Curated annotation (Swiss-Prot):
Its main location: plastid. It is a multi-pass membrane protein. GO terms for biological process: ATP synthesis coupled electron transport; electron transport coupled proton transport. The gene is ndhD. Its EC number is 7.1.1.-. The chain crosses the membrane at residues 4-24, 35-55, 84-104, 111-131, 134-154, 167-187, 208-228, 242-262, 274-294, 305-325, 330-350, 386-406, 411-431, 463-483. It catalyses: a plastoquinone + NADH + (n+1) H(+)(in) = a plastoquinol + NAD(+) + n H(+)(out); a plastoquinone + NADPH + (n+1) H(+)(in) = a plastoquinol + NADP(+) + n H(+)(out). This is NAD(P)H-quinone oxidoreductase chain 4, chloroplastic. Belongs to the complex I subunit 4 family. It holds the Pfam family Proton_antipo_M. It is an enzyme of class 7 (translocase).
Length: 497
């Protein structure tokens, strides 16, 4: 047994290292930026080392467990542990955060605070994926809200205060339901609070209590995922945030809600989930079509990509609601796949904005010739977004479809309707994806403008783009790499149904 506190080190290192930024006497941005990148890279390497040498893929039980008494009066423990469900999101968090800090080079105002908030957000996002105590899960869930709010309010567009306020109202409001559900389930049936995930997983609850608590958690996770109609904060937030912040929001933050649905709603409240899963399937199907249709009507490039993220999250919701090992594995693959694709699309939209200072698609055009590298990478990522075979999104959506068909939970007519509606959404996806390419890169609007001069992607931007493209194509060719983490844990989760 390994007794070294790997997970505590991985969670604490970013925020502890970020605190040292304020001690730097150097005022230049370059030293601070590379220090931040090094902290993220060291944390990612530590995570990778711990998983490679101390994690057994064929063991569905919790591994790398840590348990330290934190508050004696409240009997509150600092509990960490991982399994096949959390290993993928943790690695995704480290990878995307490292690239996001590297992408934030144009930030020059209050750079010490900016990079500290990026590192604090890193710790706050790893925390929920590795927590094995439900109250610690809540604390970590709340910890990452503060950096996100400040990143939105201080670095963004003209309406950044409005979008930051809307974000905090939605997320803080949903956190009230999360706290009530956490305390309700932790204090049930005992004089002392029961907060350990393993203990909660082995308890049985009255169906009425299970449904009430399930709804509380569902609201909290539906805001973060997001699930319609609790999604309206997302387009405004993405439309105003700096693109490095958008990479963290699309790549990681949205996936926390989906992870919570599987980790808590499915694993702890199987009876309630069996009742609500048909509604999740219906909501997911509607979400795919609604968000894809709404994306077509957006003039703002970042808002169009944001609505495409909402649409793709619909597949994830369907996979969670299918209650089949195929569908749930597809949902987990979609978490990883869209984390890469969404982050990459927002990065490229930001690099385009740095050059043109334009976000409205009807004001763009003709960018393919002066910026061929950006055009090439954006085209490849658009193909990945519309689930082209050979890209990670193809297998994720295909396996979710197969999960619907093979699910034993639903009648044939329900399967046909869900599949038909979802297929319509998949037809809309290439329409808005190819529309972005047409409006941005084709035509002669900019190419014929007198005295126009553009810089194409530099080495830093090409490195970030290629770094994200490699796992997108790699997973598309060999998706079993992700399934090797999750398949045993998925069977353990579905054994409760």
């Amino acid at each position: 047994m390994n007794y070294f506190p790997w997970l505590t080190l991985v969670v604490i290192l970013p925020i502890a290292g970020g605190s040292l930024i304020f001690l730097f006497p150097h005022r230049g941005n370059k030293v601070i930026r590379w220090y931040t990148v090094c902290i993220c890279l060291i944390d990612l390497l530590l995570t990778t080392y711990a998983f490679c040498y101390h994690f057994q893929l064929d063991d569905p039980l919790i591994q790398l467990t840590e348990s330290y008494k934190w508050i004696n009066f409240f009997d509150f423990y600092w509990r960490f542990g991982i399994d096949g469900l959390s290993i993928g999101p943790i690695l995704l968090t480290g990878f995307i955060t490292t690239l996001a800090t590297l992408a934030a080079q144009p930030i020059t105002r209050e750079c010490k605070l900016f990079y500290f908030l990026m590192l604090a957000m890193y710790s706050g996002q790893i925390g929920p994926f590795s927590s094995r105590d439900i109250l610690l899960f809540f604390i970590m869930w709340e910890l990452e809200l503060i950096p996100v709010y400040l990143l939105l309010a201080m670095w963004g567009g003209k309406k950044r205060l409005y979008s930051a306020t809307k974000f905090i109202l939605y997320t803080a409001g949903s956190s009230v339901f999360l706290l009530m559900a956490t305390l309700g389930i932790g204090l049930y049936g005992s004089n002392e609070p029961t907060l350990n995930f393993e203990t909660l997983n082995n308890q049985s609850y009255p169906l009425a209590l299970e449904i009430i608590v399930y709804i509380g958690f569902l609201i909290a996770f539906a805001v973060k995922s997001p699930i319609i109609p609790l999604h309206t904060w997302l387009p405004d937030t993405h439309g105003e945030a700096h693109y490095s912040t958008c990479m963290l929001l699309a790549g990681i933050l949205l996936k926390m809600g989906a992870y919570g649905l599987v980790r808590i709603n499915m694993e702890l409240f199987s009876h309630a989930h069996s009742i609500f899963c048909p509604w999740l399937m219906i909501l997911g199907s509607i979400q795919i079509i609604y968000a894809a249709s709404a994306s077509l009507g957006q003039r703002n490039l970042k808002k169009r990509i944001a609505y495409s993220s909402v649409s793709h999250m619909g597949f994830l919701i369907i996979g969670i609601g299918s209650i089949s090992d195929t569908g749930l594995n597809g949902a987990i693959l979609q978490i990883i796949s869209h984390g890469f694709i969404g982050a990459a699309l927002f990065f490229l939209s930001g690099t385009s904005y740095d050059r043109l200072r334009l976000l409205y698609l009807d004001e763009m055009g003709g960018m393919a010739l002066p910026m061929p590298k950006i055009f090439t990478v954006f085209t490849i990522l658009s193909m990945a977004s519309l689930a082209l075979p050979g890209m990670s999104g193809f297998f994720a959506e295909l396996i979710v479809f197969w999960g619907i068909i093979t699910s034993q939970k639903y009648f044939l007519i329900m399967k046909i309707l869900i599949t038909f509606v979802t297929a319509i959404g998949m037809i809309l996806t290439p329409i808005y994806s190819l529309s972005i390419l047409r409006q941005m890169f084709y035509g002669y609007k900019f190419f014929n403008t007198p005295n126009s001069y553009f810089f194409d992607s530099g080495p830093r931007e090409l490195f970030i783009s290629i770094s994200i493209l490699i796992p997108i194509i790699g997973i598309g060719i060999y998706p079993d790499f992700i399934f090797s983490f999750s398949v045993d844990k998925v069977e353990a989760v579905l054994s409760h149904f």
